[in-house]
Curated annotation (Swiss-Prot):
Pfam families: BACK, BTB, Kelch_1, Kelch_KLHDC2_KLHL20_DRC7. Keywords: Kelch repeat, Repeat, Ubl conjugation pathway. Residues 604-616 have a biased composition (Basic residues). Residues 597-616 are annotated as: Disordered. Interacts with CUL3. It comes from Homo sapiens (Human). This is Kelch-like protein 36. GO terms for biological process: protein ubiquitination. Residues 46-113 form the BTB domain. Pathway: Protein modification; protein ubiquitination.
Length: 616
């Protein structure tokens, strides 16, 4: 028995137990902090006094060093303050210092309109970033039309990127109101004004409003005229109607700005854009672009199941937030089994059938173009041949129409459309007649697969690749499954061939193909992936926000149209249901394109992004 130990009648085993357990005091940290605060308030064991505005705040060095990089450096790298009983903090206020120290000990920060800037100043000086973050959060909630410029100045002084970004968002969301106020016109810097005028998020009724705001700002002070070109280059002059450019904008710019400002060139550029209507898709610059960061999933035309409607002229897009399909400007004419392509931010609709009987006799050669900037359809040059059940590709600065059929039967011809000349030209044709095929673009190459001709028999497995630079078609490894009326698209490094249908070689009865396979152009290899949930012959297809969308379609086995939208997640290799189309429909087309935001979308208030500021 060891001396001083408690005597027992039974000798102690070598180990009382073989198990080991850890016990934790849940309130340990808060209790220690509470006791330290009690000691501080009673003046016990405090080894430093902080001085600001000739007023004193006692504290413990170890707690200050733990909570603040500023104090940690001061007390550990040999500075003289490490040995001083009192440390004067130049640049800190007593109001701010007391609030910050109270927070370090108690974990609560009281902020109001009277102390917020003092607390922010002190917390930034002492590098207590949690307090800085709370200050930014408070100020974000209190931003108003009365104080936003002062808060923007605070954000600049203390390099508060989070607060600065939030105030920028506030100004963008209220630009139509704020930009004409004296405070804004007098105090907003040229750099900030250019940020707002170049933003796709700026709130406005029309582009002319932004021009008026810019001209108002430029004419406030004579020295600002030197920055006229730098400011006005952010105005999207081509989005202003030509008549307004000539009769309102040009006179205003000429009267308000000196000729030396050299800004008339922007107007001349815009007029040239309007004068070359067909060539606009290949005349795109930052000033012709819509002010939006959001691309929409669109569905156009098709053959509907309701007999009274037959063909559709609807153009609608999916509003993901409301999970509803919203109507855009309708097609100039009802169409089904047409093709859609996007070039230069314009939507092109080519060919298709103008009758419910789409066997080829009702094929069209018309090409319509939709401008989302002015929400108008126009007719441009027609294809050389009428086409239905074909594929239309958009590549570089041209469209490529491939195969299909018309009143003369299946086609092998291929033609390209040049917006610059508004004309179609034949290029190398397909090696065989083909219709009911599908296609996609991958790295400037056109790929088509499957399809049929007028010969009796099953559909094809073929995969063809077209290089527009050499005008040559080449065979690639065929699909594992023959199919027609299917869909193709490119996502990541793969090309997907999706669903469709085929004819039974013995009975010649049509059956649905649900299988999906992915092609690797690098390996020239096909791989099976998750099959569709539902049949999809003659459906629309598009890739939107990293997922494949299959819209509507037809089931040959069930003889039924579909309103189902199927969505493929490549990472999970899984199909799921999306938002149903308004009607059951087949023979429609889908695409993804930026659209002019609706008025209610322009006025929605944005939210600032949260991130830690570190005074950088």
């Amino acid at each position: 028995m060891m001396e001083g130990s408690r005597q027992t009648r039974v000798s102690r085993p070598y180990k009382i137990s073989e198990s080991s357990k850890v016990y934790r005091w849940a309130d340990h940290s808060s209790t220690v902090l509470q006791r330290l605060n009690e000691q501080r308030l009673r003046g016990l064991f405090c080894d430093v006094v902080l001085v600001a505005d000739e007023q004193r705040v006692p504290a413990h060095r170890n707690l200050l060093a733990v909570c603040s990089d500023y104090f940690n450096s001061m007390f550990t790298i040999g500075m003289r303050e490490a040995f001083q009983k009192e440390v004067e903090l130049i640049g800190a206020s007593y109001i701010g210092l007391k609030a910050v120290v109270d927070f370090l000990y108690g974990g609560e920060l009281v902020l109001d309109g009277g102390n917020i800037d003092y607390v922010l100043e002190t917390a930034h000086l002492l590098q207590i970033w949690t307090v800085v973050d709370f200050c930014c959060e408070y100020l974000e909630q209190e931003v108003s039309e009365d104080n936003y410029l002062y808060l923007q100045e605070l954000a600049s002084i203390y390099s508060l990127k989070r607060l600065d970004a939030f105030i920028d968002g506030f100004i963008l969301n209220h630009f139509g109101t704020l930009s004409f106020t004296p405070d804004f016109l007098q105090n907003v810097s040229m750099q900030k004004l250019c940020v707002y005028l170049s933003s796709s998020e700026v709130q406005r009724e029309c582009e002319h409003d932004l021009l008026q705001a810019a001209l108002q700002w430029l004419t406030q002070q004579p020295e600002r005229e030197a920055h006229a070109r730098q400011v006005l280059e952010n105005i999207h002059f081509p989005l202003i109607p030509k008549n307004d450019l000539l009769h309102r904008v040009k006179p205003a710019v000429c009267s308000l700005l000196p000729k030396e400002a050299n800004c008339e060139g922007f107007i001349e550029e815009a007029v040239r854009y309007h004068n070359n209507l067909a060539a606009q898709p290949v005349m795109q610059t930052k000033r012709t672009a819509l002010r939006t960061n959001q691309e929409r999933l669109l569905f156009v035309g098709g053959e509907v199941s309701e007999r009274c409607l037959e063909l559709s002229d609807d153009t609608c897009y999916l509003d993901a937030k409301s999970e509803q399909w919203v109507k855009e400007t309708p097609l100039p004419a009802r169409r089904s089994h047409h093709c859609v392509a996007v070039l230069g931010g314009f939507i092109f609709i080519a060919g298709g059938s103008f009758s419910r009987d789409n066997g080829g006799d009702a094929a069209s050669n018309l090409l319509y173009r939709y401008d989302p900037r002015c929400k108008q359809w126009i007719k441009v040059a027609s294809m050389n041949q009428r086409r239905v059940d074909f594929y239309l590709a958009s590549i570089e600065d041209m469209l490529v129409a491939i195969g299909g059929r018309n009143e003369n039967g299946a086609l092998s011809s291929v033609e390209t459309y040049s917006p610059k000349t508004d004309s179609w030209s034949y290029v190398a044709g397909l090696p065989r007649f083909t219709y009911g095929h599908a296609g996609t673009i991958y790295k400037d190459f056109v790929y088509i697969s499957g399809g049929h001709d007028y010969q009796i028999g099953p559909y094809r497995k073929n995969l063809l690749c077209y290089d527009h630079r050499t005008d040559v078609w080449e065979e690639r490894r065929p699909m594992t499954t023959a199919r027609g009326w299917h869909s193709m698209c490119s996502l990541g490094d793969s090309i997907y061939s999706i669903g469709g249908s085929d004819d039974n070689i013995e009975s010649m009865e049509r059956f649905d193909v649900l299988g999906v396979e992915a092609y690797s152009p690098q390996c020239n290899q096909w791989t099976r992936v998750a099959p569709l949930l539902h049949a999809n012959s003659e459906s629309g297809v598009a890739v939107w926000e990293g997922r494949i969308y299959i819209l509507g379609g037809y089931s040959w086995e069930n003889t039924a149209f579909s309103k189902t939208v199927q969505v493929y997640d490549r990472e999970a290799d899984k199909w799921s249901r999306g938002v149903d189309l308004p009607k059951a429909i087949a023979g429609g087309s889908a695409c993804v394109c930026a659209l002019e935001p609706r008025p209610e979308d322009k006025k929605k208030k944005g939210k600032g992004k949260r991130h830690q500021d570190r005074g950088q």
